[in-house]
Amino acid sequence: MGRCCFYTAGTLSLLLLVTSVTLLVARVFQKAVDQTIEKNMVLQNGTKVFNSWEKPPLPVYIQFYFFNVTNPEEILQGEIPLLEEVGPYTYRELRNKANIQFGENGTTISAVTNKAYVFERNQSVGDPNVDLIRTINIPLLTVVDLAQLTLLRELIEAMLKAYQQKLFVIHTVHELLWGYKDEILSLVHIFKPDVSPNFGLFYERNGTNDGEYVFLTGEDNYLNFSKIVEWNGKTSLDWWTTDTCNMINGTDGDSFHPLISKDEVLYLFPSDLCRSVHITFSSFENVEGLPAFRYKVPAEILANTSENAGFCIPEGNCMDSGVLNISICKNGAPIIMSFPHFYQADEKFVSAIKGMHPNKEEHESFVDINPLTGIILRGAKRFQINTYVRKLDDFVETGDIRTMVFPVMYLNESVLIDKETANQLKSVINTTLVVTNIPYIIMALGVFFGLVFTWLACRGQGSMDEGTADERAPLIRT
């Protein structure tokens, strides 16, 4: 009986160890999990993945911070602007996909993303309908720039004088965000109908969408999950001067493909920035007990490099690192994008304004992604809207102002997975961990039986060393 147990333990130990090593080397269970995820992460009507894509369950908030101008007269005399940050004014962002249509072969799906904003008073510093902000007159600057390029110059000069337009204006937060009717724009609209009579930093963005997208469903390849192939009927942009800069790359930022490697560079197309951007791995994170890869927008995105030369408008007219001229896609308004407080921009932009305090924690854009599922656990998209201003001798409204990139406001669009969704995701991840750890469980059993085998071997040797008195007696006695 003892000898039988001895051989059984040894055989089981060897068999289990060989099996576990074979399973680990062949990655049998890991491949099974990966294939299951790849198969399920497809945009198919009626699935959980599709429902989450159509109506994202995670709460999204957008915070607006304005820069109130405290020394307007001094600025017109050539002094440095002194700005005071006012905010946040927080809104809940409600989003859903609509007008959904699948392609004939199931590999594509078209949709628009509707967005609406609901004010959150308890997360804000004041009432946007009451609070006043003094800021630079972007409609005036837009019209002045228009006058440089058209035959309407004399007419525009006359209108500015007649209506006594000022370079700095006061409006409520609500007006600056969602729009108001501007006197000068209304007059220009009569002669140039493509110029809207209304102005707002997010005018016609509440309760609307940014156009139709065509996405890949991931049916043919999981790496293509929710990847954009068309936007507003175009497979590429036409604003920039090179084919590379005009490419529409990646997803819309709401989702990413599963099974992400930290060595990957991920791409996304935020239409409000008028270009595609890439994000790179930064660190390992833990969000609500879930593992995550933190990806960040690198400084090179807005760097003054040869790779970004195609974003210089007009061609060859490149600005210093940290800012992007997007006036070409904003109906000619002299809008310059940057990170908040000119974070990661050239020092010249920071020092030109009193009140800029860039720091990583508050002004960096990032996204924390669960690498197994590609689900976003936490994220913050932060960028600043500025305008380009300079002295123009023919327009007295500009006074003796310095040439500069003038901050208007910045936003922080953030998302954080809720506990209920996190617990559901934990259940999925824990199940996959159990499956992928089966080889280690088998190995542990092999080690256990190996120890039993060793113990039985030692016990058997001890039994041979210790016998009865008769067994130890010599066979031949004298």
From Swiss-Prot:
Known tissue expression: Detected in the extracts of brain, heart, lung, liver and kidney.
S-S bonds: 274-329, 312-318
UniProt-recorded Gene Ontology molecular function terms: cargo receptor activity; cholesterol binding; enzyme binding; phosphatidylcholine binding; phosphatidylserine binding; protein homodimerization activity; protein-folding chaperone binding; scavenger receptor activity
Record's keyword terms, sorted: Disulfide bond, Glycoprotein, Lipoprotein, Lysosome, Membrane, Palmitate, Receptor, Transmembrane, Transmembrane helix
Membrane-topology annotation of the record: Multi-pass membrane protein
InterPro entries in UniProt: CD36_fam, LimpII
Record topology, Lumenal segments: 28-433
Recorded consequence of changing residue 122 to Q: Loss of glycosylation site. No effect on normal location in lysosomes
Subcellular location: Lysosome membrane
Residues passing through the membrane, by range: 5-27, 434-459
Domain of life (superkingdom): Eukaryota
Single GO biological process annotation from the record: aminophospholipid transport
Description of post-translational modifications: Acylated by palmitic acid group(s). Heavily glycosylated.
GO cellular component terms, A-Z: endocytic vesicle membrane; lysosomal lumen; lysosomal membrane; plasma membrane
Effect of substituting residue 166 to D: Abolishes interaction with GBA1. No effect on normal location in lysosomes
Residue positions with a glycan: 45, 68, 105, 122, 206, 224, 249, 304, 325, 412, 430
Cytoplasmic side: 1-4, 460-478
Pfam name, any one: CD36
Result of changing residue 430 to Q: Loss of glycosylation site. No effect on normal location in lysosomes
UniProt region (Important for interaction with GBA1), positions on chain: 155-191
Effect of residue 400 to K: Slightly increased GBA1 binding. No effect on normal location in lysosomes
Similarity-based family: Belongs to the CD36 family.
Assembly and binders: Interacts with GBA1.
Primary role: Acts as a lysosomal receptor for glucosylceramidase (GBA1) targeting.
Protein known as: Lysosome membrane protein 2
